[in-house]
Amino acid sequence: KDKEILKVIACADLDSNKSELFSKNYKIDKFSVEEIFVNDDIDLIVNLTPPSSHFEISMKSLEHGKHVFSEKPISLSMEEGKKLYTAMKKNSVYLFAAPDTYLGPAFKKGTELLNSNQIGQIIGGSASFITHGVEGWHPNPEFYYKKGGGPLFDMGPYYLTALVKLLGPVIQVSSYSEKNFNKRLVDNPEVKYKEIEVEVDTHYVSLL
């Protein structure tokens, strides 16, 4: 809860029951979403909202002079990303986004090996993630199949970040995607609903 350079001040959620429970469990204050933005004791906001809300919450945070660490994706479009960048510069704050796995020891070692030419000339890299879906285990799988969800935004950032970190920026993209199923059947007994209307593509093949 409290570290030498970090103190958790409060939590907020549109669902007051969730924020109340979190507040009691971790013994921190519970604020409304709007209170989080204007509280002078808060320097950094961790944005863990659903993907479709990332841009709105991050933008309001930046406009109120707060640093932001956002869950992936940082936004749902390039235009939204540019607006966040502009707001960050204008308000002299920092904007970070998951995943931060590229800061780990494996990537540091990989970068070291590449830069020292110990493994020769690299001509490419590959990454894959294959699974049936999250509806069999996730406590709230519906968001995954709505706007801002799907494997591209949920798992893609891990692999894309790794490739860019090790091999450099992407210049050109060729990609194919499809939905596969229009509906997903939920077989997790803890989830109340049993069927999900799929709104996003769930299968991607890309060449970068």
Model-derived segments and spans:
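Alpha-helical elements of Rossmann-like donor-binding domains used by nucleotide-donor carbohydrate transfer enzymes
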Residues: 21, 35, 44, 56, ...
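Active-site beta-strand termini and strand-to-loop segments that position acidic
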Residues: 201, 206-208
